[in-house]
Every structure is written in structure tokens, then in C-alpha cells.
Amino acid sequence: MSVNYATLGDLKKGSYIVIDGEPCRIVEMSRAKTGKHGSAKAHVVAICVFSGQKKSLVAPVDTRVQIPVIEKRLGQVLADMGDMVQIMDLETYDTFEVEKPGGNEEEEQLAAKLQPGVTVEYWLIMGKPKIIRIRSSSS
């Protein structure tokens, strides 16, 4: 599990954070200064990268939180196996299986285009791969 650490107050909308052991993208963040002797609090709403679930976190802004390290890599689709796709990394030539994207209309369209021989960009987040997009054949 590759993670870095940062202060919660330094994060912004669009950043990534680990909540309940799952990598999430921050979609909403607000800070509130509490009473006379209290510390400022941050309220974070994030969407899980893999499951799409909405997660919430309320903590002091000086709390150290985990930030997932995201490796952006290229791979080639070798086989379509129903709800899984076999991919070969184009740098290391390792082969592995990845779950097809799904959940919303955009991800369903991406899953429909996954054919053997297609080059895809995938992210390796905390040791787990996720297909992000199809690379155009011109690049």
C-alpha cells in the first residue's frame, strides 16, 4: 500500500484522500472555525475511486491524513473475460486482470470499447488497478 501523508487543511477539492482504508476523490470540502477554545474543523465529502460510494470525514484541519500514491500507466487489453479484462503493462509486460469499469453511463461506454489490442491508461492506486480511459491509436 503506497501512501503519503498530508495535513487535512492543505487538501483541496479534486485531491485524493484515504477514508476508511479506501482511496477517494474529494468533491466537497468546507472549513469551520469553532468556538473560543476549539480548533478549526474540516468537513470532507469524497467519492470512493473503486466503489463510487460517497464518504464523509469531519476532523481538525491539522490532522495528518493518508494520500494515495497514484501511478499512471499504459497497458494493452489482451482478453475480454465477461466482467473482467486481462491487461498487459506496456513497460513491465506483467499481465493481470482488472474489473471492467461500470456504475455510470461514462464508465459503461468505456467498458463497451474495451476490445483485445486496445491500449488503455490505467491507474495503480494502493496496489489495485483501475482503467481510466482508452488511449488514442495516433499517440
Swiss-Prot record:
What are the UniProt keywords, alphabetically?
A: Cytoplasm, Hypusine, Initiation factor, Protein biosynthesis
Instruction: Write down what this protein is called.
Output: Translation initiation factor 5A
Localization in the cell: Cytoplasm
Residue spans crossing the bilayer: none
PANTHER family attached here? Answer: TRANSLATION INITIATION FACTOR 5A FAMILY MEMBER
Gene3D superfamilies referenced in this protein's UniProt entry, alphabetically: 2.30.30.30, Nucleic acid-binding proteins
Q: Which organism is it from?
A: Aeropyrum pernix (strain ATCC 700893 / DSM 11879 / JCM 9820 / NBRC 100138 / K1)
State the function annotated in the UniProt record.
Answer: Functions by promoting the formation of the first peptide bond.
